Amino acid sequence: MIFSILEHILTHISFSVVSIVLTIYFLTFLVNLDEIIGFFDSSDKGIVITFFGITGLLFTRWIYSGHFPLSNLYESLIFLSWAFSIIHMISYFNKKQKNHLNAITAPSAIFIQGFATSGLLNKIPESAILVPALQSQWLMMHVSMMILGYGALLCGSLLSIALLVITFRKTGPTFWNKNIKKNNLLTEFFYFDVLYYINERNSILLQQNSNFSFSRNYYRYQLIEQLDYWSFRIISLGFIFLTVGILSGAVWANETWGSYWNWDPKETWAFITWTIFAIFLHIKTNRNVRGINSAIVASTGFLLIWICYFGVNLLGIGLHSYGSFTSN
């Protein structure tokens, strides 16, 4: 009874704090509250509080159940939210270099934890005895590595999606300006005097705004470079976790089912996801094709991760069906 009450309290504390943090980020984006001393730093400290709250929640379920809390979908979602809070700690303790991770990790943590604690999972499952298929020392190794890999890959993929959005906004007006120039050439014979006046006026405006335009383009370039850098770093880390998780799962499968690989739906999608991010890392080694191309591959991997993570859980089939919605 005490553990249930403590778990309930820690769940609400972590969710409330991360909700406040997300609100602070949203207000900062709207009204530029960075100028207020200490306001933005308090949001970072809020994620640290959330990290310890989720950590306490996981330890409470661990002590109460007697096994590592990764036996169902609810516990895996809480652990995934914990993984995002760990990634956020990187930006918190690395203040020398601004990396924009907090804009990705805070909304992701609140979305995942909100989904886990909502009524979409029917109810929050109580800690129970493991099913025979999960009673193994490989549970902590395999599932934790997979979830940590999912968290890092999702975060890196979201950074790549942000890179694509910023790049699209950068190149979009360029094509629009080219079309304007073409239309001006068509009408130049009829409105030469008017165009001459407009061009003279525009040249003055361009001289006045040249410094502002240069600083804005330079900031956008720096932002794209940072997003590309951190996307590569985090996806590389997630790829290592995913590889270790797949290999440990293969060893566990051989001990339980007598074969290393069975082409189970979860295994198949995990292999597809691993292949996509292997292609991403290969593209990053080629200076001629990296950039937007690698970001597109990472964005594709973002969808594949959710298919791999929730696909079997929605269908409730295969050897991994014990973590499905129906089992909760």
Swiss-Prot record:
Give GO cellular component annotations, separated by semicolons. Answer: chloroplast thylakoid membrane; plasma membrane
Q: Which UniProt keywords apply?
A: Chloroplast, Cytochrome c-type biogenesis, Membrane, Plastid, Thylakoid, Transmembrane, Transmembrane helix
**One GO MF term attached to the UniProt entry:** heme binding
Membrane-traversing stretches: 13-33, 46-66, 73-93, 101-121, 146-166, 234-254, 263-283, 295-315
Q: Where in the cell is it found?
A: Plastid, Chloroplast thylakoid membrane
Q: Name one Pfam family in it.
A: Cytochrom_C_asm
Which InterPro entries does its entry note?
A: Cyt_c_assembly, Cyt_c_biogenesis_CcsA, Cyt_c_biogenesis_CcsA/CcmC
Q: Name one GO biological process term.
A: cytochrome complex assembly
PANTHER family in the record, alphabetically? CYTOCHROME B_B6 PROTEIN-RELATED, HEME EXPORTER PROTEIN C
| Subunit structure, interactors included | May interact with Ccs1.
Q: Tell me which family the UniProt entry assigns to this protein.
A: Belongs to the CcmF/CycK/Ccl1/NrfE/CcsA family.
Q: What is this protein called?
A: Cytochrome c biogenesis protein CcsA
Q: Which species is the source of this protein? A: Arabis hirsuta (Hairy rock-cress)
Q: Tell me the gene name.
A: ccsA
